[in-house]
Every structure is written in C-alpha cells, then in structure tokens.
C-alpha cells in the first residue's frame, strides 16, 4: 500500500515565466508539492514504489536493516512497512539530506508506521554507514550525486549488504542510440504534457535540473555495480527513459 501525505498540493511551481532560473534544489517549495510533481514527472513511479514493497516481502530477513537512501517523503518506506510486519526485529533507516523533504517524511512515517522501529536521519548519504542490510533503496537518488562519488556509494552498499541482500536502483537513463534516445526523451515529454504540464513548465524545470541531475546509461550503471562486487543484476522495470535495476549480493559473495 502506498500512502501519501495529507499536505499534498498540486504542482504549479513553473506555470509562470521565471526571470532568473537557478539550479534545482529540494527546498520547501518543491517539498510541498513533491508527491504530485513526481507522479506527474516520472512514468511508472507509482509502480516502482508498489513493487519495492513486494520485493521487501521476499528479501527482508529477521534481525536486519532496510535502508532508503534519499527517501524524500518516505514513499518507499511506506510501501515496505506493511509487507514486513510479520518479519521479526527489522528496522527501517530512512536518510534524506533536504531539511524540507525530511519534514514531510517524518510526518508520514510517524503517522503510519508504529509497529516497526524506524530511524529517520537528516544527512548526506555519503556519510551513512550501511550495516547488516537485507535491502537498500536508491530511488532516483544516485543521479543527483557527483559522478565521482557514485562508485564509492555502491561499494559501501555492497559491503554493508548481507549475503542474499538486494539493492533497488531506480534512475533516469541516458541512451546513446541516435534514434531511440530522442524518441524516449520525446515520449517522456509527452507523458508530462498528458499529466497537465505545459511546455513552459517542462522547459523551465529541465533548465533548472540541467546542472544538478547528471544521468548515466543502463550499461554504465551495470558496470559500476559489477565493480562494486554485485554478480547478479538486471533491469526489472522500464518506462521510456526511466527505470529500475535489481542487484543481488549472492549467498556466496564475500566481503
């Protein structure tokens, strides 16, 4: 079950021309409309969140921890929670750097999750030690990190996952193919138009994200996961140029 904040508001942040567009930030304005914004901007987002809950039922083990790195409003945690109620001694650790976003996360998780220990940490995920993890979520988070830090994050996740543990890595993807890449780009814009965004809104948001969100190809992600130590991985969900990978730390893997 995916729950949403009682403070959800429609996203009209970029409906009027903005004279000076700065870089994107997850500030109070964005945080206030984030649930509406993300479901209208990322095709398949709701499906990914729902499936993360289903995956948790399969992979979370007793006496282990689940990490949601870059948890925003806590949607993935809320999806996981009802699926692991019967698994003893689990703990969810939700990490979010943005003070504005984590305010809504706290509100959501405190309102709906009272039967499993949940730790909410306001910090950069680069500072988080992963330990005794059966599941780690990176849901549209890695793309906002400096590319030079991404390998280090995945290395630490791999080291902190228990054998049999899973990483869910959801991202916007870059496609090199000169025909497929532009097609998927245009289809994504069509998706946003179909969800009520004007060309002005799409353009202004894209301009603000340009220097902040640096995306990789599926192959780059897979190579990085292999370098971290993951032996089994695959793309399990894709809609246009957005998707999600699963990476497993096999039972035979050694730290």
Curated annotation (Swiss-Prot):
Enzyme class (EC, first level): transferase
Record-level Gene Ontology MF annotations: carboxyl- or carbamoyltransferase activity; S-adenosyl-L-methionine binding
The protein's name in its UniProt record: Carboxy-S-adenosyl-L-methionine synthase
Keywords: S-adenosyl-L-methionine, Transferase
Sequence similarity: Belongs to the class I-like SAM-binding methyltransferase superfamily. Cx-SAM synthase family.
Catalytic activity: prephenate + S-adenosyl-L-methionine = carboxy-S-adenosyl-L-methionine + 3-phenylpyruvate + H2O
Cited function: Catalyzes the conversion of S-adenosyl-L-methionine (SAM) to carboxy-S-adenosyl-L-methionine (Cx-SAM).
Residues involved in S-adenosyl-L-methionine binding: 45, 70-72, 124-125, 139
């Amino acid at each position: 079950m995916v729950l949403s904040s009682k403070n959800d508001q429609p996203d009209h942040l970029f409906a009027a021309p903005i004279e000076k567009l700065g870089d994107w930030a997850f500030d109070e304005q964005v945080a206030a409309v984030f649930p509406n914004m993300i479901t209208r901007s990322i095709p398949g987002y709701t499906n990914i969140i729902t499936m993360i809950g289903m995956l948790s039922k399969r992979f979370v083990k007793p006496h282990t921890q689940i990490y949601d790195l870059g948890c925003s409003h806590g949607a993935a945690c809320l999806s996981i929670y009802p699926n692991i109620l019967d698994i003893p001694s689990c703990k969810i650790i939700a990490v979010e750097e943005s003070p504005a976003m984590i305010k809504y996360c706290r509100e959501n998780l405190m309102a709906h999750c009272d039967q499993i220990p949940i730790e909410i940490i306001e910090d950069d995920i680069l500072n988080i030690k992963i330990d005794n993890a059966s599941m780690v979520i990176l849901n549209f988070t890695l793309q906002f990190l400096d590319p030079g830090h991404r390998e280090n994050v995945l290395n630490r996740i791999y080291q902190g996952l228990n054998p049999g543990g899973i990483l869910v890595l959801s991202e916007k993807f870059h496609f090199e193919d000169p025909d497929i890449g532009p097609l998927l780009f245009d289809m994504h814009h069509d998706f946003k138009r179909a969800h009520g965004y004007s060309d002005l809104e799409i353009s202004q948001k894209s301009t603000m994200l340009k220097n902040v969100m640096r995306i990789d190809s599926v192959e780059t992600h897979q190579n990085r996961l292999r370098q971290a130590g993951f032996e089994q991985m695959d793309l399990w969900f894709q809609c246009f140029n957005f998707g999600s990978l699963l990476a497993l730390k096999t039972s035979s893997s050694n730290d």
